[in-house]
Amino acid sequence: KESSAASDVYKRQLTDSVIEMVEESGFPGMKVLQFAFDENEDSPYLTHRYERNCIVYTGTHDNETTRGWFRNLSQHDRNFARAYIGCEGKHETAAVWSMIRAAMSSVADRCVIPVQDYLCLGNEARINEPSTLGDNWKWRMKKGQLNETIIQKIYKMTKLYGRLVKEETEEKEKTEADREKISDK
């Protein structure tokens, strides 16, 4: 099935020695949530198997969008994914937002959500299909697609799961102000 092409290539490259090297290096591992839902219901990509030192993605530039991926799942895998991510809505957009919630609520130190997933777009917005020529790297977000409703939804979920990042400039300004107070004394 097409939706598993990128995951099959990626998974084949993850030999025991590669996994061991990543663990020894201290670099964060990469967890692609779409890879969790295949015939293996004991997948290391399921969020309850994550360690903190990893980066979770709903999908990457080489994957289908989450909506496109969900549409192409087998009925068995779709049912398992819905049950695992707690998706009660029947519409594909409910599944996309449930995947985003699953990624954000995981223990992973970092979480990356492609904008196409926030916009609940299908595979017409896919970035790259590996080993193919043609329309790769051509998708562009249109002005106004990321509207205030979506921005607020992203903000609320990001805040809920403790993933808001303080601006470095705010921290830097506070530190500089504190130094000035000390030097004035």
Name what the model sees in each region.
Residues 1-6, 10:
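Single conserved hydrophobic/aromatic residue that forms the stacking wall/gate
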Residues 9, 56-69, 111, 116, ...:
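A broadly tuned preference for mixed-charge, low-complexity surface segments
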Residues 11-123:
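Conserved alpha/beta catalytic core and glycan-binding cleft of carbohydrate-active enzymes
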Residues 120-170, 176-185:
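Structured C-terminal cap/extension of enzyme domains
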